[in-house]
From Swiss-Prot:
The gene is Katnal1. Residues 142-167 have a biased composition (Basic and acidic residues). Regulates microtubule dynamics in Sertoli cells, a process that is essential for spermiogenesis and male fertility. Severs microtubules in an ATP-dependent manner, promoting rapid reorganization of cellular microtubule arrays. Has microtubule-severing activity in vitro. GO terms for molecular function: ATP binding; ATP hydrolysis activity; identical protein binding; microtubule binding; microtubule severing ATPase activity. PROSITE patterns: AAA. ATP binds at residues 246-253. Keywords: Acetylation, ATP-binding, Cytoplasm, Cytoskeleton, Isomerase, Microtubule, Nucleotide-binding, Phosphoprotein. One of its GO terms (biological process) is microtubule severing. The modification N-acetylmethionine is found at residue 1. This is Katanin p60 ATPase-containing subunit A-like 1. It comes from Rattus norvegicus (Rat).
Length: 488
C-alpha cells in the first residue's frame, strides 16, 4: 500500500471540497477511505492499527460533512413555491363568455447535463490499485484558483501532517480502540458493547472447584493456542468451538469466564434475548455484527449460554422462518471464525464456547461446528469439600466444623446447590439474633453482634431445607448422549 498515494488522495479530496467541487471531492474521499480500510486489514501492530482507524474516522466525518452540503444544495434546487389553496369564497365571478386566464406552467429546475470538458485530463495509467476506481478530475484547477486557495491548502496539509504524526507516534495513551460500526445501526452497536463485552472477567481456575478434566481440555483447546501460536498450525489448528454439556449449576459459565481471564481475551456473554428482535432481518444483523465485533476485539471468547434456545434442531413442525434464518446466519458465521489457520494471525483467534442443558435438542450442523464436546458432571466428594471452602472463605467458621463430613452428605448436589446451602447457613446466626426485635432495635445493632461464626448445626439445618435440583434420570440421559456424541 503506497502511503504517499493515500495522503495525495486525501489532500485532493479536501482541496476540491474547499473549491466547491463537491462531486470530485466525494469521489476522492470514498477512495481514500477504502484504501485506509485495506491498509488496516494488513497491519499486525494494534497500536498502529488504532491510529489508522482514528484517521479513517476523521476522514469519514469530513466525508459526511461534504455529503450534507451536497444534499443541502440539492434541496435548494428541488424546492418550489407552495401552492396555497383558494377557497370558493375568494374565487372571483367569471363571465361564461370570457375565456379564463391560462394555467401557469409548472417550472422545475432542469436536470444537470454533464458536458464534456476539454480541459479534463485522462487518468494516469500508473495509478495504484487502490485508486483505480477513482473518477478523474472534473475540472483542472487554474493558477488563479490555486493562488486563492493557498491558505486553505496549508491548513489541510497541516491536518494531514498531524494525522501522519499520530500514526507514527503509536498509541501512547493506552486507549482501547473503538469498533467502527459503519453500515449498522448505532444503537445496535452500543447495545452490544454495553450488554455483551466484558473485558477481564477476573475469574481464575482456582475459583472453580474440581472439574480438573474439563479445565485440562479447555486449556488445550483455548489457552495453549494463545501461548504457543507457532505450534498450533496446520492439522494442529485450534478448535473452532467447544460445547460444554451438563446439568444446571455445575459451573459451565464460570469455566467460560476463567478461559477468558487466563487468555486475556475479550469475553462476549451471549444469550437468546441478545440476538433476537421483533423486526424482520434485525436478528441476522445482530448475529453478523456480534462476530464482526469479535474479530475486531480479537483475541475473543464468545460464550453462548443456553445455545439450544438459539440453534435448536431445524426442520421441525413448530419452527418459524425467522428462527431458521437466525440459525443459518449463526452457522455461517461460526464456520468462518476458525482462528489460527495457515494465513491468519494466531493472535486474532475467535473461540466460540457454548453451554447447554439439553444437548439432544441441538442442530446437527451446529454439533459438527462445535468440535469439542465435553461433559461437566456433578462435583465429586473432594470437589464438594473444596467448593464448601471456597463458598465459606469470607465468613468465620466454628472450629468444630469438618467440611469433609458435610461434603459426604451432599452426594448428588450440584455446585449451585452447595453454594445455596452455604449462603443459607451464613444467614442463620443473623436470623437468631434479630428474632423478636423491632425495626428500631435491628437498626441499632452493631456490626460485631451480627458477625457470628457459622456452626455445624447451621450447615445441617440448611442441608435439610435445600434439596437436590438434578435427578438421577437426567444424569443418565447426559451420560448416554456423551457416549453417542461426546468428543472429549
Amino acid at each position: 500500500m503506497n502511503l504517499a498515494e493515500i495522503c495525495e488522495n486525501a489532500k485532493k479530496g479536501r482541496e476540491y471540497a474547499l473549491l466547491g467541487n463537491y462531486d470530485s471531492s466525494m469521489v476522492y474521499y470514498q477512495g481514500v477511505i477504502q484504501q485506509i480500510q485495506r491498509h488496516c486489514q494488513s497491519l499486525r501492530d494494534p497500536a498502529t492499527k488504532a491510529k489508522w482507524q482514528q484517521v479513517r474516522q476523521e476522514l469519514l466525518e469530513e466525508y459526511e460533512q461534504v455529503k450534507s452540503i451536497v444534499s443541502t444544495l440539492e434541496s435548494f434546487k428541488m424546492d418550489k413555491p407552495p401552492d396555497f389553496p383558494v377557497s370558493c369564497r375568494d374565487e372571483p365571478f367569471r363571465d361564461p363568455a370570457v375565456w379564463p386566464p391560462p394555467v401557469p406552467a409548472e417550472h422545475r429546475a432542469p436536470p444537470q447535463i454533464r458536458r464534456p470538458n476539454r480541459e479534463v485530463r485522462p487518468l494516469r495509467k500508473d495509478m495504484g490499485a487502490g485508486a483505480r476506481g477513482l473518477v478523474g478530475r472534473a475540472h483542472q484547477i487554474s493558477k488563479s484558483d490555486k493562488a486563492a486557495s493557498r491558505d486553505k491548502d496549508y491548513r489541510a496539509r497541516g491536518r494531514d501532517d498531524k494525522a501522519r504524526k499520530n500514526m507514527q507516534d503509536g498509541a501512547s495513551d493506552g486507549e482501547i480502540p473503538k469498533f467502527d460500526g459503519a453500515g449498522y445501526d448505532k444503537d445496535l452497536v452500543e447495545a452490544l458493547e454495553r450488554d455483551i463485552v466484558s473485558r477481564n472477567p477476573s475469574i481464575h481456575w482456582d475459583d472453580i472447584a474440581d472439574l480438573e478434566e474439563a479445565k485440562k481440555l479447555l486449556r488445550e483447546a483455548v489457552v495453549l493456542p494463545m501461548w504457543m501460536p507457532d505450534f498450533f498450525k496446520g492439522i494442529r489448528r485450534p478448535w473452532k468451538g467447544v460445547l460444554m454439556v451438563g446439568p444446571p449449576g455445575t459451573g459451565k459459565t464460570m469455566l467460560a469466564k476463567a478461559v477468558a481471564t487466563e487468555c486475556g481475551t475479550t469475553f462476549f456473554n451471549v444469550s437468546s434475548s441478545t440476538l433476537t428482535s421483533k423486526y424482520r432481518g434485525e436478528s441476522e444483523k445482530l448475529v453478523r455484527l456480534l462476530f464482526e465485533m469479535a474479530r475486531f476485539y480479537a483475541p475473543t471468547t464468545i460464550f453462548i449460554d443456553e445455545i439450544d434456545s438459539i440453534c435448536s434442531r431445524r426442520g421441525t413442525s413448530d419452527e418459524h422462518e425467522a428462527s431458521r434464518r437466525v440459525k443459518s446466519e449463526l452457522l455461517i458465521q461460526m464456520d468462518g471464525v476458525g482462528g489460527a489457520l495457515e494465513n491468519d494471525d494466531p493472535s486474532k483467534m475467535v473461540m466460540v464456547l457454548a453451554a447447554t442443558n439439553f444437548p439432544w435438542d441441538i442442530d446437527e450442523a451446529l454439533r459438527r461446528r462445535l468440535e469439542k464436546r465435553i461433559y461437566i458432571p456433578l462435583p465429586t466428594a473432594k470437589g464438594r469439600a473444596e467448593l464448601l471452602k471456597i463458598s465459606l472463605r469470607e465468613v468465620e467458621l466454628d472450629p468444630d466444623i469438618h467440611l469433609e463430613d458435610i461434603a459426604e452428605k451432599t452426594e448428588g448436589y450440584s455446585g449451585a446447590d452447595i453454594t445455596n446451602i452455604c449462603r443459607d447457613a451464613s444467614l442463620m446466626a443473623m436470623r437468631r439474633r434479630i428474632n423478636g426485635l423491632s425495626p428500631e432495635e435491628i437498626r441499632a445493632l452493631s456490626k460485631e453482634e451480627l458477625q457470628m461464626p457459622v456452626t455445624r448445626g447451621d450447615l445441617e439445618l440448611a442441608l435439610k431445607k435445600i434439596a437436590k435440583s438434578v435427578s438421577a434420570a437426567d444424569l443418565e440421559k447426559y451420560e448416554k448422549w456423551m457416549v453417542e456424541f461426546g468428543s472429549a
